[in-house]
């Protein structure tokens, strides 16, 4: 009896998905920024995969799922939503956020647990942002961080 050929490794399938649909993919994520007063700011961003451009970002001290949903409304006005939205399994991206993503007509794609390589475009942008900007500036508050990020 012949054995059926094995399916490609999950990593290869994921990479094929990213390459084949890059024009229709956006990713969202958070990263933390320490402040001068030892507080922590959370920077939320949405990035397009095709040109690696930031579609939307905002800063908050206390991210909630309701706040994330509002940011998604601002990121995708009217019919500008991508086909797929990649995000990790962070506590802020709960079932409420997943349901609202579906209501926008976007297919949510959650990455595997502790697999930052699956959201490489977003993780790369976070690394560049830290190296090029945040390693050289001490952030005072959320307004200061927003101004720095706009530049």
Regions found by a protein language model. Give the residues of each.
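Charged DNA-binding/catalytic regions of mobile-element recombinases
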Residues: 1-151
């Amino acid at each position: 009896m012949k054995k059926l050929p094995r399916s490609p490794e999950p990593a290869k399938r994921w990479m094929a998905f990213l390459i084949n649909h890059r024009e229709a993919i956006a990713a969202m994520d958070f990263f933390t920024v320490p402040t001068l007063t030892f507080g922590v700011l959370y920077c939320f961003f949405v990035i397009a995969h095709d040109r690696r451009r930031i579609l939307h970002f905002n800063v908050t001290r206390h991210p909630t799922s309701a706040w994330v949903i509002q940011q998604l409304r601002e990121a995708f006005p009217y019919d500008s939503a991508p086909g797929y939205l990649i995000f990790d399994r962070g506590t802020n991206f709960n079932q409420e956020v997943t349901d609202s993503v579906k209501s926008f007509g976007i297919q949510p794609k959650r990455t595997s647990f502790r697999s930052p390589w699956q959201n490489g475009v977003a993780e790369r942008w976070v690394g560049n942002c830290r190296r090029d900007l945040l390693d050289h500036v001490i952030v005072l508050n959320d307004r200061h961080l927003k101004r720095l990020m706009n530049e």
